[in-house]
A protein has these predicted regions:
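Solvent-exposed, extracytoplasmic
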Residues: 74-88, 149-196
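Extracytoplasmic/periplasmic sensor domains and loops in membrane signaling proteins
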Residues: 68-81, 104-135, 175-176, 191-221
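A short beta-strand signature within small-molecule sensing/ligand-binding domains used
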Residues: 135-146, 216-230
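N-terminal sensory and localization modules of signal-transduction and trafficking proteins
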Residues: 15, 19-23, 127-130, 184
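Extreme N-terminal signal-anchor transmembrane helix of membrane signaling/transducer proteins, especially
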Residues: 1-14, 18, 22
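Histidine kinase transmitter module recognition
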Residues: 1-4, 31-34, 38, 171
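Extracytoplasmic/periplasmic ligand-binding sensor regions of membrane-associated signaling proteins
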Residues: 70, 86-160, 167-168
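Extracytoplasmic/periplasmic sensory segments of membrane signal-transduction proteins
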Residues: 22-119
Length: 230
């Protein structure tokens, strides 16, 4: 009887663990999909701005000091940029940086030399580049604007609230858990650890990497789940 009970208990425990892993995987996959959706949404918005004819015409206007140029800036450019914060409240700053001569206009239109020491000053392609800064609490999108001198004359900079982009990583689970988001260079872009009952299991990213190398799924104390943010 004791042997039968042990076998039954072991099998039941295995079934429960497998069910818990499946539930966690579903929750985790949904959280990552939500981040991917956020990134895709903002990338689509940047596509619209990067190829917008109004911005190009204002930036490339021959007489930037004319009243007509200023009027168009106020009546067309400003409302368009203002609308970004209305439709995307997570946006902290949206700026078009131009390498040619430009009359600065608030935070919306600035000379590129102001950013010349930053890594995103000169994207060499038309791809969208993402940067995350845990200390500043920002996620930044940077891309060249192809219609401004073949992409060499200006670029679009959009800074967003870090917590809004990665908000779905606050997993809706009762168990203690931790989340790391890292890039190809193994740099941590986001970290969230909720070890409320078992603080001893909280780990540094280097500890996670050691466990990750040993086993992809189950360890004695952890369940490891992974999914790529596209």
């Amino acid at each position: 009887m004791c042997l039968m009970f042990t076998m039954f208990y072991t099998q039941m425990r295995r079934v429960l663990v497998e069910r818990e892993i499946k539930n966690l995987q579903t929750t985790f996959d949904q959280a990552v999909d939500d981040v991917n959706t956020e990134l895709a949404l903002h990338q689509s918005m940047s596509d619209y701005l990067a190829f917008d004819q109004t911005i190009v015409q204002i930036v490339k206007a021959e007489d930037k000091n004319s009243f007509e140029a200023y009027e168009r800036m106020v009546k067309e450019f400003d409302p368009m940029m203002d609308s970004l914060s209305y439709f995307y409240p997570e946006i902290r700053q949206s700026t078009v940086y131009v390498r040619d001569f430009v009359i600065p206009h608030g935070t919306y239109l600035r000379p590129a030399r102001e950013m010349e020491n930053d890594e995103w000053t000169a994207p060499a392609d038309n791809d969208v580049h993402w940067y995350a800064d845990m200390d500043q609490g920002t996620v930044t999108l940077v891309r060249s604007m192809p219609l401004i001198d073949d992409g060499k004359g200006g670029f679009l900079y959009i800074s967003m609230d870090y917590s809004k982009i990665f908000g779905s990583m606050e997993l809706a689970v009762n168990e203690d858990y931790g989340v790391f988001v890292y890039n190809e260079d193994k740099e941590v872009l986001y970290e969230n650890q909720k070890m409320t009952r078992n603080a001893k299991y909280q780990m540094e990213f280097s500890d996670f990497q050691k466990i990750q190398k040993k086993e992809k799924q189950n360890t004695a104390n952890y369940i490891l789940l992974e999914k790529e943010i596209e």
